[in-house]
């Protein structure tokens, strides 16, 4: 029986449309703010309000799923995201845009929690890696296509908002034709995010999501700046970023399959080691293409494998809470990593971007090498 059931395929189709909209807005909002002559610190504050919304949305979505189920939570999340999009055209100004991006951030985080939790609850310990790999492939493909859309269509605010809003609403349609069962509502005991974060046997998965956030946040946010400082033109920067993201897309399926077959612990060790090698290779600047490719293939696949590791260690009814904890951990890492790396780059050297990535990866590798007690029969086996 295929792991890609009808509900899973429809869920991923909806996610693709929503991710396209997210990618377009995340690229154009800072440009719209700059065109409005807002100072850089205000542009940064609007971006921060979006990520703050991500944190807030992550915290309460589990409760929402338990109360109204996956489908209705997904509809509500999409409508909140659409409202945050429409608001940008209704009210113009720093404070109003901060508010609307905060609302959009809540909606986006809710979408991620709902989709990831639904996929984990649909799978088993034997195929969850492949399900999460498919999720990440769709997510990165949507991000990639969103960047292409930005380069091909008009970037005017009032030209973009109508079709982006329509795309968000179209993302609701696939789930109108299926129902995703929430087995958590039948559980006697609910789990909290804090309890999942404290769970000793899942700590490597939580730490892996933090490290993944640091690595990806730093690469996404600061790699273009690093390349710019190397004297590259915008077209060249776009090419190398495409290489990085493409490697992440291509690496998802093999890593997910290997993790299901040989175990997540072994695959995580190999991934982290390859991230370290890729970072060191970037410092030499001798072979940027293979260095960026292996860095993208290993770095962009850390998150789903770490998620699958953590989800092996909990009961089935705890999967939604665990997913919230993992997404929260990733978000914290993606906020801290670029901030710290940017400070190092500004005050010392651009090369410290890769030294930092290699250093945090090495610390995580030591944690993985210390763990020799991988559970042969995972708890979440159903």
UniProtKB/Swiss-Prot annotation:
Superkingdom of source: Bacteria
Cytoplasmic side: 1-7, 66-74, 123-130, 178-203, 252-269, 312-324, 370-382
One Pfam family it belongs to: MFS_1
Sections of the chain in a coiled coil: none
Ranges per topology, Periplasmic: 29-44, 96-101, 152-156, 225-230, 346-348
Gene Ontology molecular functions: transmembrane transporter activity
GO CC list: plasma membrane
Membrane-spanning ranges: 8-28, 45-65, 75-95, 102-122, 131-151, 157-177, 204-224, 231-251, 270-290, 291-311, 325-345, 349-369
Primary location: membrane
Membrane-protein topology: Multi-pass membrane protein
Leader sequence residues: none
SUPFAM superfamilies given in the database record: MFS general substrate transporter (SSF103473)
Compartment list: Cell inner membrane
UniProtKB keywords: Cell inner membrane, Cell membrane, Membrane, Transmembrane, Transmembrane helix, Transport
Similarity remark: Belongs to the major facilitator superfamily. YcaD (TC 2.A.1.26) family.
HAMAP family in UniProt: MFS_YcaD
Name of the protein this chain belongs to: Uncharacterized MFS-type transporter YcaD
Organism in which the protein naturally occurs: Salmonella typhi
